[in-house]
């Protein structure tokens, strides 16, 4: 929520340019925008740059699908989602917030509690973005989240509309139409 970051995000919003944030928790040796437990900095950013599409990504973002403590915020929490965290609350409150499921953090958040993951995908299918990331080594390991989504589609746990929104339509909806 640094004023310089807010200004940058507002400028991007004026040009209809979405911005992806790699969010982390406090600590040394990480990269991205630091945000304490509960995502208060992200919430202030969303409030102060309401015309900017903000795409959340990274461990500090996805760990907040359920309540998390500071030591686990920059990691990959496991186990059932017994209570919702800051992430679902923010998605419900701020229509300019989107969620990128690329990399292990998004995949982990959605698969740590399969029933909750499916419910999350259904509720927020209009603001979840499929992406890829360089953190997976080989081509077969690069996109486990695509196999996960395809499996949910094949089993009927998500419908074709949700699958299509997540895997492409949502992104096309937020990218600016540039005239060349």
PLM feature segments, named:
Residues 1-130:
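Catalytic pocket-lining loop regions of alpha/beta-barrel enzymes
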């Amino acid at each position: 929520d640094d004023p310089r970051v807010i200004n940058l995000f507002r400028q991007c919003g004026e040009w209809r340019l979405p911005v992806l944030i790699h969010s982390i928790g406090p600590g040394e040796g990480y990269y991205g925008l630091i945000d304490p437990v509960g995502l208060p900095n992200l919430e202030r950013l969303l409030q102060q740059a309401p015309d900017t599409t903000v795409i959340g990504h990274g461990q500090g973002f996805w760990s907040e699908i359920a309540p998390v403590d500071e030591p686990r915020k920059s990691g990959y929490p496991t186990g059932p989602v017994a209570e919702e965290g800051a992430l679902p609350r923010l998605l419900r409150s701020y229509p300019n917030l989107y969620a990128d499921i690329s990399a292990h953090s998004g995949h982990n958040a959605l698969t740590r509690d399969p029933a909750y993951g499916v419910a999350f995908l259904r509720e927020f299918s209009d603001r979840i973005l499929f992406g890829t990331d360089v953190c997976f080594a080989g081509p077969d390991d690069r996109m486990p989240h695509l196999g996960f989504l395809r499996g949910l589609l094949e089993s009927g746990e998500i419908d074709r509309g949700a699958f299509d929104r997540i895997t492409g339509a949502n992104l096309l909806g937020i990218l600016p139409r540039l005239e060349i």
